[in-house]
Amino acid sequence: MVGLIETFRKNNNEKLKNDQDKEKNDREHLRQVRADRRERYTKAVEQLGDEKAPIRMGGVYTLVGLVDEWLEDESIEKYEDRLKEGQVIINNLCAYIRSPFNLASHYDELSKANPTPKGIYKGKKEKFYADKATLDSEADVRLGIIKEIHDRLQGPDKNTPGAWSDFEYDFSGSTFFYPIDFTNSYYAKPINFSGSTYTSWADFSGSTYKGWAYFNGSTYQRETNFDGSIYKGRADFSRSTYKGWAYFNGSTYKGRAVFSDSTYKGRAVFSDSTYKGWAYFNGSTYKGEAYFGGSTYKGRAVFSDSTYKGEAYFRNSTYQSKAIFNGSTYKGRTVFSNSTYTSWADFSESTYTSWAYFSGSTYKGEAYFRNSTYQSKAIFNGSTYKGRTVFIGSIFYSDVSFGENNENGSSSCFTKYTPNFYQKNYYQKTLFGSINNNFTVDNDKGHPIYLNPEGIPLKCKFLTLEQKEYLEGKFQEIEKINNKLFEVKDLKEKEELSKKLQALNEELHKWREEVTTV
């Protein structure tokens, strides 16, 4: 019996020693593995600064492989600790993308096959081809980084995370002198692309952003695509310039969406989107067509103080909170038809150069169209107004119609209140320039528009011949300046023309206030 006990004790001691030795060996192995990774990391970072592009590319692939190794290292129990190790390397890759590259400032010229007659490479063919090769090789290195990141931001199914989706990415202030493809990407953490410049096309469509997404203060020189994306946090695209077509349609914004103070030089498409938080588009300029139709705004929608130089479409939209369009200028055809406004809607202090359509819509709250100028026809046919509706202080230079809507065959209906074209308390009236108006509304279900013997709303007046001539002259001046703005390329001359245009608009605004004041 004593022998058995002694044998058992001896075996236990040997097992304990073996376990301790194994644990020690494992720790030593892990230490060596991690030391090896850090050594490879240091060498790879050094390679990123090498003059030769293939060596820089080798450093990129080493760093990418190290991130994968850290994430797959099950000897590190906590996933957060693995992420922490990987994030250090991600920060290096992002820093490389952010780093300036001098030749990128000549991208437009170096992207051509041969030197241009008027460029800085005129008469310098050898330097042109040498710089072009240098720029292209650096673009390949950076494209390699973007591709490796992009591949790991995509899950097996749509809108699912990839292996690298839990990292934070900071590309702020970058100049992307190569095409950007981040389609169908999934970001679980905040991302930052603010203050960036895209010299080629950029595609972020079909992506999901769980945290804040910063794209503000950026410039896109070619086509840009953010279609079909989901933003679960704040999305900031403010103070940006889009020189090519910009697509944001079919997207969902669950947090605040900010597109204010931006300029769109090509077509801008925001249609068929859903905004669950507040949406800001104020202070923006659209030089091409602007599409916002078929969208739903569950929070406040702010489009005030904007300029639309092309056609603007807002039809078939639903506004469940306040809709604010005041202080805007529409130079092309504008369509707000077949929309629903649950709260109050404000279109006041606006100017419509071409036809303006508000037909077939429902206004459940107050609707303000006051202090505005309608140069061409204004169509309000077949709409329902359940709250107070105010047109006072406006000028309808051409025809205005509240009659039957061609689509549903019904006239406009003011269910609770007679519309205000004259308001003694505000000392304002509305002026009309045409005799071909239609003020026929549904009197059975709502209130009439009371007319004077001249056939326009009570207490209102027709524009005098002198007033019409003044307006016609100002309209022609504005059109002339707008045409010049499209033709002129000199920035200083453009600035002077813009100042003249602003002064004319301010003069018209002041004049309208004076002539509509009782």
Give short role names for the model-derived ranges.
Residues 28-30, 42-46, 52-57, 61-64, ...:
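N-terminal leader/targeting and pre-domain segments
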Residues 1-35, 39:
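Membrane-embedded hydrophobic alpha-helical segments
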